[in-house]
Amino acid sequence: MKEFDLESYDYYLPKELIASYPVLPKEKAKLLVYERRSQKITHTTFEHVLDFFPKNALIVLNDTKVIKARLFGSKHAFLPSKTTEVFFHRFFKNNTALTQIKGKIKVGDKIFFDANYHAEVLELLHNGQRLIAFYDNKTPLNQENILKLLEQYGHMPLPPYIKRADESLDAHEYQSVFAKHMGAVAAPTASLHFSQNTLEKLLKDFKHAFLTLHVGAGTFLSVETKDIREHQIHTEVLRIPKKSQEILQKSQEILCVGTTALRSVEYFKRLENPNQEAFECDIFLHFANPILHVNYLLTNFHLPKSSLLMLVSTMIGLEKTKEIYKTAIEKKYRFYSYGDGMLIL
């Protein structure tokens, strides 16, 4: 079936449509609304997004907060040039961290961030990740202090298709206005469209629930297997508070703000009698594992051959997805993280 063929999810995108900066004010970003029942497409802007939200739907939002995950250091304590990049992925056991480090590296190597702080490479993992520990002189840092180090010395982890260094505006624009729990290394991008004013109106007028999926670096990876069913998707840390779990269990109609919220809901709703708040989410949604519990989705426009494009295709069909993306390109919609959005009803 073509739905399982990786090449079915390829498309050409002119480079000028890859958004390098956000639209400001946020409400001026374009929004494509697609109503599946009537197959009607409406072109509007985010200042009208809540007008299209179904009144009885539960709105689910991901309140993860992006950390400054990119660090630059030197392999020698007294060298002023910091040319070794460390990309923090997530915490591991005993206050260690999973990272990617550019360039040649071996176990025992140290990377210095200033006169006091450094990291030591503990293990080279098979998937290209490096297990490291952070230190203040000879004292190991705990998770709280590692986050403080990242906040002080780190850079916002802009996606690889944004071909510029991070700037001061990214510290707040590559972060949703309701971001709360630190841990993501990529923003849940549909959330970026909400201004404080739009959020307050949503919280006042709609049933809503928050969850936290710490978006991992794997979100940018293309699927590589010719048959998409053979793809092993990345695992991400998910937390759903008991209050949100209760609301989700009772709700019949759900609208997710972003694919991360949708994947979280689908993962949770398939569990039998969940009795905890913390999970490891590794759900991959495609035509052989379709969406079962979410009715509507607000999302951005996604990369070719990405698992997120496959997710969207399961909601509206492969051919309709291609047709809508073609329309968006013709109408000069801006794509990817800082781009415009699409509401599927």
Swiss-Prot record:
It holds the Pfam family Queuosine_synth. One of its GO terms (molecular function) is S-adenosylmethionine:tRNA ribosyltransferase-isomerase activity. Signal peptide: none annotated. Its EC number is 2.4.99.17. It is found in: Cytoplasm. Keywords: Cytoplasm, Queuosine biosynthesis, S-adenosyl-L-methionine, Transferase. GO terms for cellular component: cytoplasm. It catalyses: 7-aminomethyl-7-carbaguanosine(34) in tRNA + S-adenosyl-L-methionine = epoxyqueuosine(34) in tRNA + adenine + L-methionine + 2 H(+). Pathway: tRNA modification; tRNA-queuosine biosynthesis. Its main location: cytoplasm. Belongs to the QueA family. Monomer. PANTHER family: S-ADENOSYLMETHIONINE:TRNA RIBOSYLTRANSFERASE-ISOMERASE. This is S-adenosylmethionine:tRNA ribosyltransferase-isomerase.
